């Protein structure tokens, strides 16, 4: 009988390091999905794919189990299915280490008995479901499902009790000896999004509203304090309700809420996200308390990019709260699905702010669920690829998190995508092909060879984001009839934020600059000395202390400071261009642009970027020599000024072109590693270039030699950054 696995995440040599039995281990994994026909480890197709990955060095595997599957109607625990799930993996790979994703959903019968403990929706009634056949139990999560509320004390107690019993019981079995991590899962697709958040406005159920009232009373010092803060004399807590959809979709200035008049909406989103984070921490803590030996506690969390304009409705604004908790070791996320990130030639970057995660000492795991040519894509029948393209994408997607100090799992929907050759084959996994398996083995060996080495990433560009800013921005439900799975929807009330998040990230990744990212809440502790260019992106709300820190610590040492869109337009008490002007040094106004199209032009670069509707946008008054961009009607949209200690820039719309960022970087004295518009990654001693066009390149990694090379078209090439040696071509 094998000795029980012990696992932890520890800060070693500049990175959060996964330790399995005390040994640094590259966190690259293979994962089964929850899809019927592909979810049970002992069945022939999943077992084959587990064995294939094991043959190529993989020892870390992931699979799902639901509390509902291990409890009988009276709540008695039966671990048979969970043990069999782990045993199937161990049968295919005897020295496997297993991460179990434990879904904390209460059974439908529980929800029917406790309707007041379930989520509610401001715009629609919850929709009871009737299960039929082998359904994915999470398939209706983004409708308006009947689900226990995150804020229900009764559900929290139910989940903690049964999760604790599950962990203690499984850990005592022979199969439990192979488990190195428990990933707690709930919310849409287990990813801790509010149920129904795409097209509905959660959570307005009785449990959530009762918790909101308690939270408000604590925040504002009782009922009278709430009435004062909301400027509603005589308001009682009993009268407090969650905001309706109209209130959530309303803005005061452009996309910004009034922090006084709309305080009730801002308060509600603050409550939703603090309570959500506290629930994740609580469940991870239950695992920690119940598992009798060191185990990695994991959770989907920290989603920032690719949130479809629904950041406040269903994102993770309180990520700093989770990062500060010792109960959570590992944050995970599905990939960015935007057209600029997902396909060949895209960036393949993570949904989270990985710099902040790494500095907090948490391990980050990406999900790699990009389809391959082996069996196609179950949600996109028009998908096409080739094995060489599959190799290029696999390399890019697995090395993206590796170069940022994290890891990934390959999430295999291929088994439910159909058979590529009906007369010869049945269901087949996405990576069940010799060249793809060999490539995974090479990537794993590359990552494992670095697992115990010092980590470094020579970034000289820093992008600062504040997830909490989205509590101050209007957001709108998507229209169900317009939704197509796999197609990115756009917001009806906020056309700018996607340019500040996805647009900035994608263009920076393809600029040849090396950037890191940070949370605004990290401002007091950050070391700014490595950075020549600091970008304030989603920072609409900056209080007096933050403005002082920016003026004193960021705008110093000749650094260039870039303000994007509505940065600093609110101080938490007032909102508008005059608030921004008072601290930025730029004469600023709200410009009601009938055609909100910006043309940037400087240092040989030109970029045209526009909104799809008339909108109120920032405009500036400054000497013509300091104007680098104009709106369609000629009003200045992008300006700069030189101060004694720093150079300041302001953009009405953020640059979304790699060339614009390169020009800014050169102005600031940043190193440009690659002059071409293609995904260029640097970190952990690796330089990675992902290209569609290919051709001759001159690459300049910091601290390394100038590399002159001819890249193949549609390829991902990996270099040793310090020597220029080609590691994978």
Where in the sequence are the language-model features?
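Hydrophobic targeting/anchoring helices
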Residues: 293, 298-502, 590-616, 628-632, ...
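Hydrophobic faces of well-ordered beta-strands that scaffold small-molecule active sites
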Residues: 26-32, 61-63, 98-102, 180-184, ...
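The substrate-binding groove and active-site-proximal loops of carbohydrate-active enzymes
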Residues: 27-40, 64-80, 140-161, 260-278, ...
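Aromatic-lined substrate-binding rim segments of carbohydrate-active enzymes
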Residues: 43-132, 167-171, 280-291, 541
């Amino acid at each position: 009988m094998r000795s029980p696995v012990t696992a932890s995440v520890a800060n070693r040599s500049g990175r959060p390091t996964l330790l399995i039995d005390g040994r640094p281990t590259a966190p690259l994994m293979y994962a089964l999905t929850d899809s019927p026909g592909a979810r049970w480890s002992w069945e022939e197709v999943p077992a084959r794919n587990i064995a294939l990955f094991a043959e190529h060095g993989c020892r870390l595997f992931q699979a799902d189990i639901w509390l509902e599957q291990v409890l009988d109607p009276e709540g008695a625990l039966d671990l048979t299915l969970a043990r069999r799930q782990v045993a199937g993996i161990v049968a295919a790979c005897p020295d496997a280490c297993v991460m179990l994703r434990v879904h904390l959903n209460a059974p439908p019968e529980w929800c029917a008995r406790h309707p007041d403990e379930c989520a509610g929706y401001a715009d629609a009634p919850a929709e009871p479901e009737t299960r039929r056949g082998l359904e994915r139990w999470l398939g209706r999560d983004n409708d308006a499902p009947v689900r226990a509320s995150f804020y229900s004390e009764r559900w929290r107690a139910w989940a903690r009790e049964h999760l604790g019993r599950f962990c203690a019981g499984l850990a005592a079995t022979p199969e439990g000896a192979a488990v190195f991590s428990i990933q707690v899962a709930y919310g849409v697709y287990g990813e801790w999004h509010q149920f129904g958040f795409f097209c509905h406005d959660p959570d307005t159920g009785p449990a959530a509203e009762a918790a909101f009232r308690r939270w408000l009373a604590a925040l504002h010092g009782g009922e009278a304090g709430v009435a004062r803060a909301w400027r509603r004399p005589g308001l009682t807590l009993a009268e407090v309700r969650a905001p309706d959809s109209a209130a959530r979709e309303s803005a005061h200035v452009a996309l910004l809420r009034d922090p006084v008049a709309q305080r009730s909406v801002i308060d509600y989103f603050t409550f939703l996200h603090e309570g959500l984070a506290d629930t994740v921490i609580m469940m991870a803590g239950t695992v920690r308390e119940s598992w009798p030996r060191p185990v990695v506690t994991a959770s989907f969390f920290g989603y920032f990019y690719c949130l479809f304009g629904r950041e406040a409705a269903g994102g993770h604004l309180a990520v700093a709260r989770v990062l500060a908790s010792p109960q959570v070791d590992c944050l995970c996320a599905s990939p960015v699905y935007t057209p600029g990130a997902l396909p060949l030639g895209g960036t393949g970057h993570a949904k989270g702010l990985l710099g902040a995660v790494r500095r907090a000492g948490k391990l980050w795991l990406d999900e790699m669920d990009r389809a391959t040519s082996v069996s196609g894509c179950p949600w996109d029948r028009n998908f096409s690829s080739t094995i060489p393209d599959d190799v290029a994408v696999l390399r890019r997607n697995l090395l993206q998190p590796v170069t940022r100090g994290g890891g990934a799992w390959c999430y295999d929907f291929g088994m439910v995508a159909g058979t590529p050759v009906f007369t010869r084959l049945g269901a087949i996994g996405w990576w069940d092909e010799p060249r793809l398996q060999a490539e995974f083995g090479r990537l794993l060996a590359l990552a494992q060879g670095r697992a115990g080495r010092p980590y470094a990433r020579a970034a000289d560009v820093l992008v600062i984001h504040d997830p909490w800013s989205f509590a101050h921005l209007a957001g709108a439900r998507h229209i169900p009839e317009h939704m197509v799975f796999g197609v990115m929807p756009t917001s009806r009330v906020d056309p700018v934020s996607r340019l500040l998040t996805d647009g900035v990230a994608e263009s920076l990744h393809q600029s040849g600059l090396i950037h890191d990212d940070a949370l605004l809440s990290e401002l007091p502790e950050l070391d700014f000395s490595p950075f020549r260019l600091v970008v304030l992106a989603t920072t609409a709300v900056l209080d007096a202390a933050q403005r002082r820190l920016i003026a004193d610590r960021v705008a110093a040492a000749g650094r260039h400071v870039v303000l994007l869109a509505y940065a600093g337009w609110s101080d938490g008490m007032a909102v508008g261009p005059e608030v921004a002007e008072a601290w930025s040094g730029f004469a600023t106004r709200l410009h009601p642009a009938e055609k909100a199209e910006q043309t940037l032009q400087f240092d040989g670069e030109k970029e045209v970027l526009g909104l799809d509707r008339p909108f109120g946008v920032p405009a500036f008054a400054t000497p013509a020599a300091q104007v680098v961009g104009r709106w369609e009607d000629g009003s200045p949209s992008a300006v700069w000024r030189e101060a004694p200690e720093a150079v300041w820039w302001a953009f009405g719309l953020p640059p979304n072109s790699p060339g614009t960022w390169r020009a800014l970087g050169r102005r600031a004295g940043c190193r440009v590693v690659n002059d071409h518009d293609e995904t260029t990654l640097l970190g952990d001693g690796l330089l990675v270039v992902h290209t569609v066009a290919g051709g001759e390149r001159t690459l300049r990694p910091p601290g390394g030699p100038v590399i002159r090379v001819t890249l193949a078209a549609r390829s991902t090439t990996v270099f040793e950054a310090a020597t220029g040696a080609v590691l994978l071509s």
